[in-house]
Amino acid sequence: MSYVFVNDSSQTNVPLLQACIDGDFTYSKRLLESGFDPNIRDSRGRTGLHLAAARGNVDICQLLHKFGADPLATDYQGNTALHLCGHVDTIQFLVSNGLKIDICNHQGATPLVLAKRRGVNKDVIRLLESLEEQEVKGFNRGTHSKLETMQTAESESAMESHSLLNPNLQQGEGVLSSFRTTWQEFVEDLGFWRVLLLILVIALLSLGIAYYVSGVLPFVDNQPGLVH
């Protein structure tokens, strides 16, 4: 069975709904252009989109959507148009326009559950199963991404609080970073061996100044020997 039979909707006194049941695209378009409400319902709360989707008439579904039909509308049992679908192209159209594949009616049944009960063809079942699997994977990825975002925000907040509580530390890190950058630029400009030679000359000058001031050579034991 490829669509849902609705006993009290097989004949209706609402022209637009009857046109959707009959699959009459031309008459449906004429009625919509004349101002008919695209969301008008039958006695069970079904809209034209429900009835067209149940019969796999994707052209009328697209027409109704163009004129403002609500793809999320539910009947009095909580069924969306997707719950009544039994055709691949109609399912793809509804899902691409915002209907969730895992949405439940008032009895807790998803479109996949109802499709299996109706015994629709295997291609439709496989499509619904694939869409449900993608929905679950997307939810898991979204949850993981949100957790990572929260953890990053908490880490940044903690670092900011630490910096506010320790302004001297933040200032010291800035000075150290500036000194390191300046030293690297100095070494690159002068050359490693020249810098090494300069350090050696400075060290020797320091030793000479120390001897001149104190009269004592550094690193030399200048204690007077014992007089015998």
Swiss-Prot record:
The keyword Nucleotide-binding does not apply. Its main location: membrane. It comes from the Eukaryota. It is a single-pass membrane protein. Keywords: ANK repeat, Membrane, Repeat, Transmembrane, Transmembrane helix. GO terms for cellular component: membrane. ANK repeats lie at residues 11-40, 44-74, 77-103, 107-138. It is found in: Membrane. The chain crosses the membrane at residues 195-215. Pfam families: Ank_2 (PF12796). The keyword Membrane applies. PANTHER family: ANKYRIN REPEAT DOMAIN-CONTAINING PROTEIN 39, ANKYRIN REPEAT DOMAIN-CONTAINING PROTEIN 39-RELATED. This is Ankyrin repeat domain-containing protein 46. It comes from Rattus norvegicus (Rat). The lineage of its organism: Eukaryota, Metazoa, Chordata, Craniata, Vertebrata.
